[in-house]
Amino acid sequence: MTEQLLVAIAAESIREDLVDALISLESVSGFSLATIDGYSRSHSEYDLKEQVAGYRRLCRLEVLHRPDQQATLLQALQAVCEASPVRYWITPVTEGGHLGGTSPI
């Protein structure tokens, strides 16, 4: 069965809630979470500091999962995202593996 990659961009304010939601799922063996700077032509929801800087501090979440885990994963994230909308996309993974060494990351 092929795997998929869920990528979600969320406000930093719900970062810990996202972590809690994913850790609670038995089917999720791990995920990546990074702080990013999000740029947009729509500045209407930026605060003054963000408008001056030209970007908003966000977090990027990545979860490698099987297609049959997708609904459960999205349901868990939906519960966290009620107050702060999250943009996401899911793409198929055509190849993956480990390079170098004998221990996976």
Predicted feature locations:
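Positively charged, small/polar-rich N-terminal and surface patches that mediate targeting and assembly
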Residues: 1-105
